[in-house]
A protein has these predicted regions:
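PAPS-dependent sulfotransferase catalytic core
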Residues: 1-81, 85, 97, 101, ...
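Generic structural signal for small/hydrophobic residues in well-ordered secondary structure
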Residues: 22-23, 65, 78, 94, ...
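ATP-dependent NMP and nucleoside kinases share a basic, alpha-helical "lid"
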Residues: 87-105, 144-145, 151
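N-terminal hydrophobic signal/anchor transmembrane helix of membrane proteins
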Residues: 98-118, 140, 194-208
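Structural motif corresponding to alpha-helix initiation and N-cap regions
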Residues: 59-62, 71, 87-88, 144, ...
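Short aromatic-enriched loop/helix-cap "lid" or pocket-rim segments at secondary-structure transitions
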Residues: 90-91, 115-119, 172-175
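Generic structural signal for well-ordered alpha-helices
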Residues: 62-66, 91, 147-148, 224
């Protein structure tokens, strides 16, 4: 019997955020489903739209994006570039390239996300703590601002917002919830999922800077308060740094 021909077209889903929130783990989890495929070479992050900060996106660029997503009939193809939600220019470009796509967002306690980024930087760069850009790290944790911006390009019902902490606690349930959002059957219900790696610090929590806690809450408490309104099922009990807002 002849093999079914591969087809190309806009991605069926795109993960757009957020950095240091377990997105690599969750993308790999999704790829366990026989009907979900990654771009050629199983690459997770395409960063396709980054280039258009310096040049306009043309129709041929849109076609080139579509060509990256090859799948057989009934398969779903997608990518996950966590920077897309953070970059203000990307959501309108993504809307133009894939107006019918479904978006997935994975969020995490913003202070723990910052701490994870700090640990990642320290591990990779000598004297990394001195080079860590705290202002940029705080901006990347302004999830309400980013989600509001995303909703200006995509209807909220096209966006699934997950909590990293909930996915760790109830991985099977959140995996099935994600499949339902994508319109897929549950496949073989896994008894457990692979544990998340690379998103937590080991041992005691890394210290940041003296008196930084107050500055972080001043910047991020209002964001989390607005995020609670944008995501009604957000469970702040899973974010101890912000449980006082619940």
């Amino acid at each position: 019997m002849a093999r079914r021909r591969l087809v190309t077209g806009p991605p069926d889903f795109v993960g757009v955020g957020a950095q240091r929130c377990g997105t690599t783990w969750w993308f790999r989890t999704l790829l366990r489903h026989r009907r979900i495929v990654a771009p050629h070479g199983r690459q997770k992050e395409l960063h396709f739209f980054d280039r258009f900060s310096a040049q306009p996106m043309r129709d041929e660029d849109v076609e080139a994006y579509h060509a990256l997503f090859q799948r057989r009939p009934r398969q779903l193809a997608g990518e996950w570039t966590p920077r897309y939600m953070f970059d203000p220019a990307t959501p309108p470009l993504l809307r133009r390239a894939a107006p019918e796509t479904k978006l997935i967002v994975m969020l995490r306690d913003p202070i723990e996300r910052l701490r994870s980024g700090f640990a990642h930087r320290v591990a990779r760069v000598p004297q990394g703590s001195k080079e860590f850009n705290a202002i940029d790290a705080i901006e990347r944790g302004r999830f309400a601002t980013q989600l509001e911006r995303l909703y200006r390009s995509f209807e909220p019902e096209r966006v699934l917002v997950l909590q990293y902490e909930r996915c760790r606690r109830d991985g099977v349930g959140e995996y099935q919830r994600t499949l339902r959002f994508l319109g897929l059957p549950d496949h073989r219900r896994p008894k457990r999922l692979e544990r998340a790696r690379g998103t937590t610090t080991t041992g005691r929590k890394l210290a940041l800077w003296p008196d930084m806690d107050e500055a972080l809450h001043a910047a991020l408490d209002p964001e989390v308060g607005r995020l609670r309104d944008l995501v009604p099922d957000l469970d702040l009990a899973l974010w101890p740094n912000f449980a006082h807002l619940g």
